[in-house]
Amino acid sequence: RNLAREATHSPTRHPAAGMLAENEKGPTMRIVIKVGTSTLAHPTGRLNIQRIELLCKVMSDLKNAGHQIILVSSGAIAMGFGKLNLPERPKDVPTKQASAAVGQCELMYTYDKLFTEYNHTVAQLLITRPDITGGGQQRENFHVTLERLLELGALPIINENDTISTEEISIGDNDTLSAMVAASIRADLLILLSDIDGLYDSDPHKNPDARLIPVVERLDDHIRALAGGSGSSLGTGGMVTKLQAAQIATEAGCEMVIANGHHPAALYDIAAGQPVGTRFLAGRKDL
């Protein structure tokens, strides 16, 4: 993995950021938040209780402020192999799918318990590629159900259905999934929380003078060349998938931010348009 460093953010507003907080949409937004495995779990695969509690508290507060929150959560496989006492993340498909089946139960139990403390109702949606990219009834059902859940005030929690997904119907990573969801429901903002702080102009592991890029106005070959390898040992994503997600989201008119999930309270600053991580500016939404 390239391009990682401890998260920092300034209290000053970047002149190109914060458009969503100040434009004609008003103070509330439709926000998709993707949480990576490294944010939710310790390296052992066991749940990082302190972090997930704070994460749910902040998302509940943002929802109380009037924002619509959709959570795309990784972590099922990692929590499953931890609970099954496997020594490391499984590599064969049957064990991955078995771990997902066990871990998804623990994941949703935890979310339901924590969000209930703040009087919010959660809903689980486990999907595969045809549910969101197909042109048939599956896609329509997913979209209608998700919109209805938001109308009813629920907090949808989405994950790929790893227990039944095959290569043919797999989306592959939740960076891409979250961007597809954001595009599908015309979200205003997509936030990717992971163990990386954003996009750097060079590898900060090798270059101590590497600088975080606060704003990307356009995804071009130079920006894509900055992407490094794959993600952490617990997850499946990396900077490459995050830039692919940025392409999907921004083309649909949705801004995207990459930030470090080790600091969940940073969600407040991100929603307010403060310069946290790297913000990818969106194209204009179709009318």
Roles of regions detected by a PLM:
Residues 25-287:
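C-terminal catalytic "cap/lid" subdomain
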